[in-house]
């Protein structure tokens, strides 16, 4: 009896443990998604107490700026009206450092800041040095000529004489460092003196002179602390709720984030929208496919073909016009009127007429498309590669002799890639806290549910076996009683009178 009672209590105990495991597993299945969501919301908002605040304040990911130049091979022939021939040079790679300063939390659930950036040349990653000479179109001459096309003959003559006096030509041979970070040009002083409204440029002239040791303006974005639906969205840039560069309300809108973090809990129907001060506009990327980066699930977002499409191909872009062929965006309105165009490298995703007009271009989606890999649960970028090209529209301008017989063409100057991938300690921390732990908890809840189900079977099986033993014992007892009754009945039948007579008769025989 002692052993049987002990076994019964063990079975009951295991059943109770199983019930608790099953209940805990069910509770975790029901509650865990909500808890994870709350933790994510708590740690992706812009708040000093959140896990992502330090990452937001000073990006720990190493960013690189890689620049590729389109060196002009036949400048003399271009002046005679022949097709341009270019040769790609580079990359010239710079390490980019960013950190936010003047961080001010406002009463309306927003935070204001400026982001300082500095660039440092990386010889070991580059194909060449900053002292390399490259032949490019002289933007001040050829760009200025297009800007002067509608001016009076007198102004054009003055410009021609000024260029000749200063020794300015249609194409220049300058170093990488000068082209990017600026050089002293007497023509800039000439323009500022005689045509002050043409180029509001002071000091050095360079394509990226405003990108180094500078900032991209004062951003005010929503923190998501009080209103999660607006997390990371830009409220104002330099105090503006919209820009005034373009010709439609929609194109002037400041939409999306500042381009560093997005709202969490993305789906394939989500899009990445951000405002780019360099492009003077908001841009939208669309979902391409799902993937994995260093064990972390990601969504890849890429640029749709409509990003730089002209108004005839994509009517909402009409506000960015006047336009030329589809696939390039005229940014002259935010670049002092200079005939500069923005596009994908090598005119990828643009009208083939553009790449066919210049020899040496080979658009390739694997080399020239841009992408951002985002962790969909948190909205934090894991890996990115943003590639853009700057081109100059050049042509012969009557009255300005330096332009010769140049045929109208959009001539690429350079393309650049801004890339970065999370790695090292930030990646390990991110993976452990936001990927590994939720996965472990997910496995635990199902293990508890399965274990609970198995343990609940123990008392059930014990009860069934106990009933079976009782049935066998009862069946054996009943059979024994029936045998005894049969023997007794047989004995009594032998002692009855009828039975005795029969026995005597048989004896006589």
Curated annotation (Swiss-Prot):
Topology class, membrane: Multi-pass membrane protein
Post-translational modification: N-glycosylated.
Location(s) in or outside the cell: Cell membrane; Membrane, Caveola
GO cellular component: caveola; cell surface; lysosome
GO molecular function, one term: lipopolysaccharide immune receptor activity
InterPro entries: CD36/SCARB1/SNMP1, CD36_fam
Keywords for this protein: Cell membrane, Disulfide bond, Glycoprotein, Membrane, Receptor, Transmembrane, Transmembrane helix
Record GO biological process: adhesion of symbiont to host; blood vessel endothelial cell migration; cholesterol catabolic process; cholesterol efflux; cholesterol homeostasis; cholesterol import; detection of lipopolysaccharide; endothelial cell proliferation
Transmembrane segments: 12-32, 441-461
Parts of the chain on the Cytoplasmic side: 1-11, 462-509
Glycosylation site list: 102, 108, 173, 212, 227, 255, 310, 330, 383
Keyword Glycoprotein listed: yes
A Pfam match: CD36
Keyword Nucleotide-binding: no
Family: Belongs to the CD36 family.
Database matches in PANTHER family: SCAVENGER RECEPTOR CLASS B MEMBER 1 (PTHR11923:SF110), SCAVENGER RECEPTOR CLASS B TYPE-1 SR-B1 (PTHR11923)
Function: Receptor for different ligands such as phospholipids, cholesterol ester, lipoproteins, phosphatidylserine and apoptotic cells. Receptor for HDL, mediating selective uptake of cholesteryl ether and HDL-dependent cholesterol efflux. Also facilitates the flux of free and esterified cholesterol between the cell surface and apoB-containing lipoproteins and modified lipoproteins, although less efficiently than HDL. May be involved in the phagocytosis of apoptotic cells, via its phosphatidylserine binding activity.
Protein name in UniProt: Scavenger receptor class B member 1
